[in-house]
UniProtKB/Swiss-Prot annotation:
PANTHER family: KUNITZ TRYPSIN INHIBITOR 2, SERINE PROTEASE INHIBITOR 5. The record marks 95-96 as: Reactive bond for trypsin. Keywords: Allergen, Disulfide bond, Protease inhibitor, Serine protease inhibitor, Signal, Vacuole. It comes from Solanum tuberosum (Potato). Induction: Not induced by sucrose, methyl jasmonate or wounding. It is found in: Vacuole. Tubers. Not detected in root, stem, leaves or flower bud. Inhibitor of trypsin (serine protease). May protect the plant by inhibiting proteases of invading organisms. This is Serine protease inhibitor 7. Belongs to the protease inhibitor I3 (leguminous Kunitz-type inhibitor) family. A motif (Vacuolar targeting signal) lies at residues 25-30. Has a single chain structure. The record marks 143-144 as: Reactive bond for chymotrypsin. CDD domains: beta-trefoil_STI_CPI-like.
Amino acid sequence: MKCLFLLCLCLVPIVVFSSTFTSKNPINLPSDATPVLDVAGKELDSRLSYRIISTFWGALGGDVYLGKSPNSDAPCANGIFRYNSDVGPSGTPVRFIGSSSHFGQGIFENELLNIQFAISTSKLCVSYTIWKVGDYDASLGTMLLETGGTIGQADSSWFKIVKSSQFGYNLLYCPVTSTMSCPFSSDDQFCLKVGVVHQNGKRRLALVKDNPLDVSFKQVQ
């Protein structure tokens, strides 16, 4: 039933878009699409790289970074972590790849997107830069964020950026099965919150019921 509802929901923008589309009147973004802003107040650009930083300071702060997962047999670093404080190393740069990229280079709230670590790597490790949600971890009681995802595919790699109820933004994981038919949706019934759990003394990004991670975005110069 939920899948049927989601399909109906996703068809609405298709009807709206197709009714106004001609070769002389190209598809435009929904009128209520709100650009995601970085800490400088500039709109995020899919061609640029950003660090995902905390909206808090001190022990409550810390950038997001790529690191080695405990007990992982992956040939490359594949864990997504957050530093234990904002005093220390900078996070690993990322870029955001929107599912509606044919509308332009902007990144918008509630838009389905992929997240990729923007780093130089070997050919072997290229696929270990794209975010996804891994299998259920029984010891932690949740699913952990890791790399090894796929850009533009309906698997475990779709996320959203939404405005936080407190400060900055939240990240959501949205396991939809029909991606391009519904690039924008403010209905988060089908999305799960991204937060932090503690794994071997580190803060690991994971799916949570409460206390989602509040983040901001800082452009890498």
